A protein has these predicted regions:
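Helical "lid/coupling" subdomains associated with nucleotide-phosphate turnover
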Residues: 3-168
Length: 168
């Protein structure tokens, strides 16, 4: 047991350049995206994950943060986007099946149709690529679900630091 960690074995963290805006501009030229564009996007995501994250421990919990995950959670749970607050979605689970179902619905809609269904303008443009990243990542990790968190990684690092200051 690592000293001072209360039995924690360690946490895996990895940053990979798979931003939804960059991927949208690079791969999703049509509105709605064409099948070949979606296939190329998925292939790129898979290749990037295989190259940058060749190993990840099985059965580890996956925490999803950020706007795409929050929007997917809201869509699946019929939460209006203006009602997305940490108290409402933190700790909720999203399964791979639920994420892929949302992606399948969105990929056949135009940006305007996504906006009509409640996505804000900026998010509606990148949501398909963002959801594809989340889905492909869960597949890569052999994970069946993720836990939604509106706290981001920087906030988590700050909290860990502050807790260490208080107990150190």
């Amino acid at each position: 047991m690592p000293e001072g960690k209360g039995g924690e074995e360690g946490i895996a963290a990895k940053s990979v350049s798979l931003g939804a805006m960059v991927l949208t501009k690079a791969f999703l030229k049509s509105d709605p995206p064409l099948e070949r564009e979606m296939n190329a996007l998925s292939e790129h995501i898979d290749q990037t994950l295989n190259r940058k994250c060749p190993y990840f421990p099985e059965n580890e919990p996956v925490i999803g943060t950020g706007g795409t995950v929050a929007a997917l959670c809201a869509m699946h749970n019929d939460i209006l986007l203006n009602e997305i607050v940490p108290k409402r979605i933190n700790g909720l689970k999203l399964t791979l099946f639920q994420i892929e179902s949302c992606l399948e619905k969105m990929r056949h809609l135009t940006i305007a149709q996504r906006i009509e269904r409640g996505l804000e303008s900026g998010r509606s443009q990148v949501m398909v690529a963002g959801a594809a990243v989340v889905a492909r990542l869960l597949r890569h990790l052999n994970a069946s679900e993720l836990t939604v968190s509106m706290s981001d990684l920087l906030e988590g690092a700050l909290m860990d630091f502050l807790e260490g200051e208080q107990h150190g």
